[in-house]
């Protein structure tokens, strides 16, 4: 069973926490290098891939309402990650499953998300047949602020454990319903288990219409970018990646939507090394595949960043 402690540690976004200084100071250059760990035994390509160069900004000082102002995070170095004996894909378990819960509007393109996740993790990703919310028998409530229905994440995670197929590395439920991890929390965007290979996240609050705001002309691109972030963030947790405190990184925790929007789509050197250690992918080919996807999706800034990483990792950059 996923406890509240686990929910605090691994939730993608939680809202309702009161801003309070936890005395967090961003790690300095030496601490960031120690988090990456020694790379002298790696290939030249991997040494360049995990180098802390200027394409990876360090973690900024959190604002009063940001995640690290409200939650104590000690960080997870690459060495600590290795010692934790995280879940790793093997010859049998190499498929990531996405389980839709409830109805999805046409603009929520699940095939695009499936394709993106396949490029990001360099693994096969399959979308399962959608099921209704009622079929799961999940605990629900009406949020006192939004007056919208919410589903208890712990119930979904328990239900998903029975859905792990023999070839499944993990299974992630995706829904348009709002979520909450326990009665005292306002809501949560997503939650995943670091050890049990199950997770859930919601698209609901990524659409400006949820808050009664007008949808801009590029709102579909905005929703796609947000959905890509939470999908890969939560799946990253199922690989054993904890929240990142070292660089501006996809795996940073976030306490509100604006903070989530500030997070990049990419992994920092520490977290990239963790994922590459687990999945064993070719870093350059992965960057190339992600850049092509982003170009086709109209995410031009992200595509340019990825192409710059291709050059630097190959050794042809300045």
Annotate each predicted stretch with a short phrase:
Residues 152, 202-204, 268:
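Helix N-cap / beta->alpha transition motif
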Residues 107-109, 182-183, 212, 262, ...:
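Generic domain-boundary/flexible-linker signal
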Residues 7-17:
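Bacterial N-terminal signal peptides
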Residues 165-232, 238:
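Active-site-proximal segment of zinc-dependent metalloprotease catalytic domains
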Residues 99-103, 204, 254-256:
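Short strand-loop junctions, especially beta-strand C-caps/beta-turns
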Residues 19-164, 168-170, 174, 284-318:
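N-terminal low-structure segments adjacent to metalloprotease catalytic domains
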Residues 214-293:
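The catalytic-center signature of Zn2+-dependent metalloproteases
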Residues 1-6:
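Positively charged n-region of N-terminal signal peptides that target proteins for export
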């Amino acid at each position: 069973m996923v406890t509240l402690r686990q929910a605090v540690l691994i939730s993608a976004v939680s809202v309702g926490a009161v801003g309070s200084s936890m005395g967090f100071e961003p790690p300095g250059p030496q601490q960031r290098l120690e988090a990456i760990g020694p790379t002298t035994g790696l290939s030249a390509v991997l040494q360049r891939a995990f180098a802390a160069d200027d394409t990876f900004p360090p973690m900024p000082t959190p604002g009063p309402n940001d995640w690290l102002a409200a939650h104590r995070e000690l960080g997870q170095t690459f060495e600590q990650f290795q010692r934790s004996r995280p879940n790793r894909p093997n010859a049998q378990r190499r498929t990531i499953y996405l389980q839709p819960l409830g109805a999805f509007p046409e603009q929520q393109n699940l095939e695009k998300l499936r394709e993106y996740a396949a490029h990001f993790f360099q693994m096969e990703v399959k979308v399962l047949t959608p099921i209704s919310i009622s079929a799961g028998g999940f605990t629900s409530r009406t949020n006192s602020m939004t007056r919208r229905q919410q589903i208890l994440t712990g119930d979904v995670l328990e239900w998903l454990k029975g859905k792990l197929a023999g070839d499944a590395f993990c299974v992630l439920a995706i829904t348009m319903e709002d979520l909450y991890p326990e009665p005292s929390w306002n809501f949560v965007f997503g939650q995943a288990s670091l050890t049990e290979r199950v997770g859930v996240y919601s698209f609901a609050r990524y659409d400006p219409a949820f808050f009664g705001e007008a949808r801009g002309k590029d709102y579909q691109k905005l929703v796609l970018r947000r959905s890509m972030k939470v999908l890969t963030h939560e799946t990253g947790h199922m690989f054993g990646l904890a929240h990142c405190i070292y660089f501006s990184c996809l795996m940073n925790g976030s306490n509100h939507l604006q903070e989530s929007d500030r997070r990049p789509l990419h992994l920092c050197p520490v977290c990239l090394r963790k994922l590459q250690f687990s999945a064993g992918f070719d870093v350059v080919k992965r960057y190339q595949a992600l850049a092509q996807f982003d170009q086709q999706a109209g995410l031009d800034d992200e595509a340019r960043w990825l192409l710059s990483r291709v050059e630097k990792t190959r050794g042809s950059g300045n």
